[in-house]
């Protein structure tokens, strides 16, 4: 029996599973859903539901789920495992797990609902670890089993209430005039967008012809950074780079001139080597030319989408402003709905714009041409390297220096520039990050960006457009962050102590990180938090303060649980590395070896009824172990938590875990500023 403790829950008693399924089908018919969602519904809930109805009520009854009485099953290889899905024709499937992976643009250590609920809401699933498996929970505590399932539904509902990914998917689908499921695929969505756009213009789209991708094309430019510490850094970003490159160079299938390209290297173009370009042609960065006498349909579509997004974003911000002052409850509700509508519309336009290049660079796209794809990527390289040269020339001239590289790093559409020399020349007494004069410097740099750098950048990009005989000048670069300190360790690996981001001034500086273990999902959460805290000391404190922090954190770390200190990983190729004689083969990756050890142990100890084995494609956590120990290996992986029956809690190699999860990532950063994470004994201190 189930006792109801909440007004928003209704329980319907069923005499058996057949009765339950019949009542469910009756409810399904009355609701008549258009969309089915949940967490991993594609490969679990939907096929399970279809299979149970088929087995107990027959295939004909299972087909009642579909308004067209059609259900198609499909097998798919996912991370080494064969997964079966069931397509209920007439009911769209928007698996929230897929929506989250597609539209959040962040890598998580796990995509289990338990973890995502904690990340997004600070809530977790109901813990049933004392029962081992859901089957045991179902048999021994039916009340908790029902509450567990209710909580699962609530987590998905609350995540969507916060993120509104279903609303965004619907906005994308309606705007592009595609089926809901098509929002996952850039190629199909853009194929329909272009088809409808040209159809309105009275143009029939050519048949799809797949030629194959005969070679790779160049990607974005990433400068080798100036490794180390840099003070007073500003970053400048190009706005929607690839869509604007398509607009600037009029890149489109019907404007492409199929002729021998100009034999100019990217360095020739960066240094503005003289070149004669006919007035009716646009020169792209890969030497290809595009017509200038007509406006291509792709640039027109990009411009309209961009303009629509600007309008929607402006309407959203206006509604948000009105909401702050509104007191009438009914009007407030209307404004909230307006905000939601315009937010989803502008996000849909943003997704469409950003996915355009992804479609153009896909060999299965109707309009794919490697020369046009290369024109876009090399155009991006030219834009960022052109402005790097110009900014360096400008700052060397202003500061009366010669050939000093003020651009610390650049990445696809961003420049990171040090203004330390400028700051020290203006603030004669000298000013350092974290000092009382910091805000004066931030204000000064903000004015420098607005009044000097941005106008100079606009002028420089106009020179580039004129040089290439561009259809239009579309490169817009604005200041993003102002940081009093930054540290680079390698390409795409940096930390910035940000005081101002796009005009938003912080009361306390915030760390912006890329490629650092503190933002990597493969680092234990306890270490991610500690690395962030340690980096704040690196940015604003002293070496001895950091060493005290590390000493305290080591104590915290060594008292933490297996699950807290273990490395999160995704596991694959378990079957490939399994060996019947020795359990695992030579050169087996450490986390896969740990998974094989775990599976072997729960089988050997007859625990498979209580604990599930680790399967292909699952997320696991692994820890190094001290030897000797009960499992006779120096590593163990677990799917969720460590079974106490294995008896290895006392054998966790905390020192090795601490070194690999915390000290080694910190050392990469600290080496660049010549700091030590821990105090080291010297001869002087040894002899007093």
List PLM regions with ranges.
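Active-site cores of enzymes that catalyze phosphoryl transfer or operate on phosphate-rich substrates
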Residues: 1, 27, 282-365
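Mobile, glycine- and charge-enriched loop segments
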Residues: 1-24
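Active-site-proximal helix-loop-helix substrate-binding element of RNase H-like nuclease domains
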Residues: 4-11, 46, 55, 59-153
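Proline-aspartate-enriched helix->loop->beta-strand connector
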Residues: 24-49
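Common nucleic-acid-contacting/processivity interface regions adjacent to the catalytic cores
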Residues: 132-253, 259, 330-393, 409, ...
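Short beta-strand
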Residues: 406-411, 469-470
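Catalytic palm subdomain of template-directed nucleic-acid polymerases
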Residues: 415-451
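C-terminal, non-catalytic extensions of nucleic-acid polymerases
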Residues: 446, 450-688
């Amino acid at each position: 029996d189930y006792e109801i403790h909440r007004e928003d829950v209704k329980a319907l008693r069923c005499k058996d599973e057949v009765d339950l399924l019949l009542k469910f089908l009756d409810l399904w018919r009355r609701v008549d859903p258009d969309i089915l969602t949940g967490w991993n519904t594609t490969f679990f809930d939907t096929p399970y539901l279809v299979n149970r109805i088929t087995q107990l009520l027959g295939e004909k009854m299972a087909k009642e789920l579909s308004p067209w009485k059609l259900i198609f099953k499909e097998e798919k290889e996912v991370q080494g495992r064969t997964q079966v899905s069931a397509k209920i024709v007439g009911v769209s499937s928007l698996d929230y797990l897929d929506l989250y992976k597609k539209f959040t643009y962040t890598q998580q250590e796990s995509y289990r609902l338990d973890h995502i609920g904690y990340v997004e809401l600070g809530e977790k699933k109901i813990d049933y670890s004392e029962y081992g498996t859901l089957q045991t929970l179902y048999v021994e505590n039916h009340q908790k089993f029902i509450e567990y399932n209710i909580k699962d539904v609530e987590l998905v509902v609350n995540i969507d209430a916060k993120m509104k990914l279903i609303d965004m998917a619907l906005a994308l689908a309606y705007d592009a005039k595609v089926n809901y499921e098509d929002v996952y695929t850039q190629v199909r969505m853009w194929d329909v967008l272009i088809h409808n756009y040209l159809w309105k213009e009275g143009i029939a789209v050519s048949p799809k012809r797949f030629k194959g991708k005969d070679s790779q094309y160049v990607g974005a430019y990433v400068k080798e950074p100036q490794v180390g510490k840099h003070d007073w850094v500003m970053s400048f970003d190009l706005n929607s780079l690839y869509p604007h490159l398509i607009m600037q160079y009029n890149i489109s299938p019907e404007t492409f001139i199929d002729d021998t390209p100009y034999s100019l290297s990217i360095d020739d173009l960066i240094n503005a080597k003289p070149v004669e370009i006919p007035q009716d042609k646009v020169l792209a960065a890969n030497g290809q030319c595009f017509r200038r006498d007509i406006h291509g349909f792709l640039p027109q579509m990009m411009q309209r989408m961009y303009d629509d997004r600007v309008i929607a974003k402006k309407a959203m911000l206006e509604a948000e402003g009105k909401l702050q002052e509104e007191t009438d409850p009914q009007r407030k509700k209307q404004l909230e709905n307006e905000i939601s509508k315009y937010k989803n519309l502008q996000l849909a336009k943003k997704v469409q714009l950003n996915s355009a290049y992804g479609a153009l660079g896909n060999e299965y796209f109707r309009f794919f041409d490697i020369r046009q794809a290369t024109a876009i990527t090399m155009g991006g390289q030219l834009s960022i390297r052109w402005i790097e040269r110009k900014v360096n020339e400008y700052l060397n001239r202003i500061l009366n220096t010669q050939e000093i590289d003020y651009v610390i790093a650049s990445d696809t559409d961003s420049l990171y520039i040090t203004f330390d020399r400028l700051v020290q020349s203006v603030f004669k007494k000298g000013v350092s990050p974290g000092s009382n004069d910091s805000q004066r410097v931030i204000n000064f740099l903000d004015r420098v960006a607005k009044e000097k750098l941005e106008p100079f950048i606009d002028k420089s990009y106009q020179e580039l457009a004129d040089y290439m005989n561009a259809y239009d000048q579309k490169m817009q670069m604005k200041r993003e962050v102002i940081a009093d300190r930054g540290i680079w360790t390698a390409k795409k690996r940096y930390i910035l102590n940000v005081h101002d981001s796009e005009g938003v001034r912080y009361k306390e500086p915030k760390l912006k990180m890329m490629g650092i273990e503190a933002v990597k999902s493969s680092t234990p959460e306890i270490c991610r938090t500690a690395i962030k805290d340690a980096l704040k000391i690196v940015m604003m404190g002293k070496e001895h303060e950091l060493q005290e922090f590390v000493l305290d954190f080591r104590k915290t770390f060594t008292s933490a649980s297996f699950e807290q200190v273990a490395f999160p990983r995704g596991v694959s190729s378990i079957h490939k590395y399994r060996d019947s004689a020795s359990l695992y083969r030579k050169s087996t990756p450490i986390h896969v070896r740990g998974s094989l050890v775990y599976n072997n142990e729960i089988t050997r100890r007859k625990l498979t009824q209580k604990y599930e084995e680790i399967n292909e494609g699952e997320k696991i956590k692994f820890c190094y172990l001290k030897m000797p120990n009960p499992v006779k290996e120096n590593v163990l992986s677990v799917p969720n938590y460590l079974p106490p029956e294995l008896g290895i809690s006392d054998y966790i190699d905390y020192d090795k875990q601490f070194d690999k999860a915390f000290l080694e990532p910190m050392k990469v950063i600290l080496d660049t500023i010549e700091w030590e994470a821990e105090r080291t004994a010297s001869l002087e201190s040894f002899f007093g």
